[in-house]
Swiss-Prot record:
Disulfide bonds join C126-C164. Changing W180A: Resistance to pea seed-borne mosaic virus (PSbMV) and altered translation activation. It comes from Pisum sativum (Garden pea). Changing R107G: In strain: JI 2009, alleles susceptible and SBM1. In strain: Bonneville. In strain: Brutus. Changing L149S: In strain: Dark skinned Perfection. Residues 53-56, 63-99, 147-156 are annotated as: EIF4G-binding. Component of the protein complex eIF4F, which is involved in the recognition of the mRNA cap, ATP-dependent unwinding of 5'-terminal secondary structure and recruitment of mRNA to the ribosome. Recognizes and binds the 7-methylguanosine-containing mRNA cap during an early step in the initiation of protein synthesis and facilitates ribosome binding by inducing the unwinding of the mRNAs secondary structures. Key component of recessive resistance to potyviruses. (Microbial infection) Susceptibility host factor required for viral infection by recruiting viral RNAs to the host ribosomal complex via an interaction with viral genome-linked protein (VPg). Also seems to be involved in virus movement from cell-to-cell. MRNA binds at residues 71-76, 103, 121-122, 171-176, 216-220. GO terms for biological process: defense response to virus; regulation of translation; translational initiation. Its main location: nucleus. GO terms for molecular function: RNA 7-methylguanosine cap binding; RNA binding; translation initiation factor activity. This is Eukaryotic translation initiation factor 4E-1. The lineage of its organism: Eukaryota, Viridiplantae, Streptophyta, Embryophyta, Tracheophyta. Changing A215S: In strain: JI 1532.
Length: 228
């Protein structure tokens, strides 16, 4: 598949760098009167060891396919984990080798959640939470999805401990990106997350926050409790 050009990321290039230190022979090893020539082939160098850049949290990509969902009665039972990553390098290795939202089939759901948190209302960490949602025309969410991932795994939110994960849902005429949080009743934290997310995405439309409990009881009739 063709990998899209990666836009300027929140995880900066200097976080993925090589070790500039080059080990050469110590001056004490020179013969008396010998001058060390830096280009001298006798100057030995050791291979550079690339240290992985650890993330503060481990994250898991999960995928729910349209075909699998049509065969299951219970919501979420067809969801499958793809890969759990804990370093910057692992993230890019996965991201650059998977389809982005614009290439996913209609009715596909693609998740990135903190490791061991399931993107389900029944998960004890998600149970009292809610979600912010940004809406996009079909095929227009790729860049915002990447920026959302980078903001989360790069711990760019002031209330990052409130975040469970994010999901992009591909539908017939639209794509929706949502950020799930833990404590819906913590208005200050939720509004802060919503405002920062809008800023990261340069999103100009209104965003709404729905409590999971309302969505569970009212389904499509659930109303926004917070807006930014």
């Amino acid at each position: 598949m063709v990998v899209e050009d990666t836009p300027k990321s929140i995880i900066t290039d200097d976080q993925i760098t090589t070790n500039p230190n080059r080990v050469i022979e110590d001056d004490n090893n020179l013969e008396e009167g010998e001058i060390l020539d830096e280009d001298d082939s006798s100057a030995t160098s050791k291979p550079v060891v690339h240290q992985p850049h650890l993330l503060e949290n481990s994250w898991t990509f999960l995928f729910d396919t349209p075909a699998a969902k049509s065969k299951q009665d219970d919501w979420g039972s067809s969801m499958r984990p793809i890969y759990t990553f804990s370093t910057v390098e692992e993230f890019w290795s996965i991201y650059n080798n998977i389809h982005h939202p614009g290439k996913l089939a209609v009715r596909a759901d693609f998740y990135c959640f903190k490791h061991k948190i399931e993107p389900k209302w029944e998960d004890p960490i998600c149970a009292n939470g809610g979600k912010w949602t940004a809406n996009y025309p079909k095929g227009k969410s790729d860049t915002s999805w990447l920026y959302t991932l980078l903001a989360m795994i790069g711990e760019q939110f002031d209330h990052g401990d409130e975040i469970c994960g994010a999901v992009v849902k591909v539908r017939g005429r639209a794509e929706k990106i949502s950020i799930w949080t833990k404590n819906a009743s913590n208005e200050a934290a939720q509004v802060s997350i919503g405002k920062q997310w809008k800023e990261f995405l340069d999103y100009n439309e209104t965003m709404g926050f729905i409590f999971h409990d309302d969505a569970r009881k009212l389904d499509r009739n659930a109303k926004n409790k917070y807006v930014v």
